[in-house]
Amino acid sequence: MTELTPLIRILEESYADVLTMEKTQFFSQGQYRLKRAENVNMRTRNRWNLEQENNTWKVVDPNYTHLRDEVTRMRMEIHPIDSRTGGVPKPANTVAARARYNQHKCLPAELIPENISPDGELVPDLSNVNLVAAWTIVDGHATITLHKIIDAKKLKSCLDIPLLGNREDQSKIRYEAAPENEMLIPNLIDEETKHSEKKTEAENKG
């Protein structure tokens, strides 16, 4: 996962760009919130394409930040956390999206099939793995956690990997299968949700 570490910086920069753009337009805060995640996603995708040409993770969607690793063939799509629950976002109401949220449980290393990489090396074949990168921004700082979700209805995950912005720190993480509990990310609420709640409280008091 060390190759994904630039995603933290790129996401933060994209978010900052979107906030700056909003200052030049005239929409309600509700309209901004509806479009903000989509705009951040698109800018993140475009930045990754431009800045990470030599990265093994390549963009595979014309509109969204959906990536695939050329070495292991693993896929990843990035989505904001559910602002109402602070948890992993639900899948879109499509067959393909639900399929990505219903995967086989995590296998021990010895049972993972192998394949030949483009460089001719023997590598794990993770072509059937789809990760969901759930992100939030708090005070301008991004938090991203990668999940392998195995139950679309209950949002159960068998793997949770915090994504760090530093390759050295990321390489030190030892990945272990997560308890198959409902995946929630407590205490992570994005900026717009906090600001919206404060605004609502002020209006109610007024």
Feature-to-residue mapping (PLM):
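Amphipathic alpha-helical segments
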Residues: 39-56
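Generic "edge-of-domain/loop-turn" microfeature
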Residues: 72, 83-85, 151-153
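A broadly used, surface-exposed interaction patch
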Residues: 75-91
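Glycine-rich loops and low-complexity Gly/Arg-rich segments
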Residues: 84, 92, 101-104, 156-160, ...
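Catalytic cores of nucleic-acid endonucleases
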Residues: 87-145
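Glycine-rich, aromatic-bearing surface loops/beta-hairpins
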Residues: 127-206
